Amino acid sequence: MSKTIDIISLGCSKNLVDSEMLMGLMEANGYKCTHDSDDPQGEIVVVNTCGFINDAKEESINTILEFAQAKTEGRIEKLFVMGCLSERYLADLEQEIPEVDGWYGKFNYKKLLKDLKGEDFVACEGKRHITTPRHYAYIKISEGCDRHCAYCAIPLITGKHQSRPMQEILDEVKYLVSQGTKEFNVIAQELTYYGVDIDGKQHIAELIEKMADTEGVEWIRLHYAYPTHFPFDLLRVIREKKNVCKYLDIALQHISDNMLTRMRRHVTKEETYELVRRMREEVPGIHIRTTLMVGFPGETDEDFEELKEFVKWARFERMGAFAYSEEEGTYSAEQFEDDVPEEVKQSRLDKIMRIQQNISSELEAEKVGKVLKVIIDRLEGDYFIGRTEFCSPEVDPEVLIPAAEAKLTIGDFYDVLITDSEEFDLYGTTIIKTI
C-alpha cells in the first residue's frame, strides 16, 4: 500500500509551484499526496519553507516544530524540510531541530524523492499536481534575481536570475489547459528581466504574446515586474491581446530620489512618474498593483511627504505597504543604521494605507452599474465568489453574487452587473454565462 505524504507549502506562490512540482513527482512514484493539512493525515510530512522576512521565518520554524512534535508523538513517521529557510540556514537548523529526517534547499528538493524511493525513482518533469482550484494556476517563468536591492535577501537565497526555456513554459501551459486550467498567473521574482540571462535581451513580451496565442488560455495576469529598464513592448501586448488581463503587479517601493538611491533601485522619481503615466496612457483601464516600503534607513519627513503625494497622484487600484525590517546579510543591514524609530514606521504605514483605502473605495465604487466578466472561484455560504480580470487570487477584491439568484458553475465565466461596492469587495448579479 502506498504511503501518504502531506506537503505543507508556506510563503509565496513561487514556493507553491515548487510544492506542486514535487507532488507531481511523488504521485508518479506511487505516493498519495495531500497539501496544507492542519492535522497531518500522511505518514510523511514535507514542509516547504519561506525565509524572506522575519515573520515568514517564524512561521516556517513554528510549523517545523509543530510537525517535529507530531513525529515525537508517533502521529507521523518521517519529517522532511525544503525551501528558502533551509537553503539559507541549513547548518543552524540541522543542529537545532534533530527530529527532521532530511533537509533540502530550494533547488535540490527532487533529491528528497530519490532518497525516499531509491533506484526506482521516476522523473516526470512538468506533471504538476495543481493545488489551486483547477481553473487557475501559477506559471513560474524564472528563478532568482540579479537586481540586488539594498533591503532584499532574495538573491542571497535564490541566486542569480535564471529564465526557464520559453518552449518549456509554453509546453507547461498547454498541459495545464488540457487539465482544465483557464487562467494563468505568471510569476517571477523579476518578471520583466525574463530572457536577459539567455541572450542579453528582454523576451517577456514575446513570451506573453505566445502564451496568449495558445488555444484554451482565457486569462493571463502578470506579477512582479520591475520599473528599471521596463520593456514598453509589454504594454502593447497587454493592450492588444484580449486574454491578457489589463493588470500589472509592479513593486515601486518609493518615489523620493533619496530613498530610491539608498535602496539601490536604479530608477529615479521622474522615471517612475513617467512609467506610471505611460501605463495609464498606453493601456486604458489598466489596474496597477504596487508595493511600497516606509521607514527605510534615512527616510526623512520630506521623503515620506513625497511618497504620500505620489500615491495621491497615481491612484493605484491595488497597493500593499510594509514597514522596513532589517534582514541580515543584505546591503542595507551592513551599510545603514536602522535609524527610523518603530513608532514612526508604524505611523507612516498607517497614514499611507489610509490614503490608499480611500482611493480603493472610490475606484471600486466607480464599477457599480458596469457589467464585468467574472470567473467563479467557489461557493461560500450564501454567495458565489468570483473575480474580474483586475483581481489576482488571494490578494485582490472579490465579487460576491447571491447563490439564491442562480446556480453558477465553479471555473466558468459570467457577465456580472455590479450592484454595490465596499472597500475591497464588489456585489453583483449575473447577466449571462460567457464561457
Give a label for each model feature:
Residues A188, Y224, L252-H254, T290-V294, ...:
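Active-site proximal loops enriched in glycine and acidic residues that flank catalytic Cys/His/Asp
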Residues C149, I169, V186, L222, ...:
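Conserved, mostly hydrophobic/aromatic
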Residues E77-G83, R88, L93, S178-F304, ...:
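Conserved SAM/AdoMet-binding glycine-rich loop
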Residues K246-Y247, L260-T261, P284-H287, E302-F304, ...:
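Extended hydrophobic-aromatic, low-complexity segments
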Residues M1-Y194, D233, L248, E270-R277, ...:
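Proteins enriched for Cys/Gly/acidic motifs involved in redox and nucleic-acid/cofactor modification
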Residues E334-I435:
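Terminal RNA-binding accessory module
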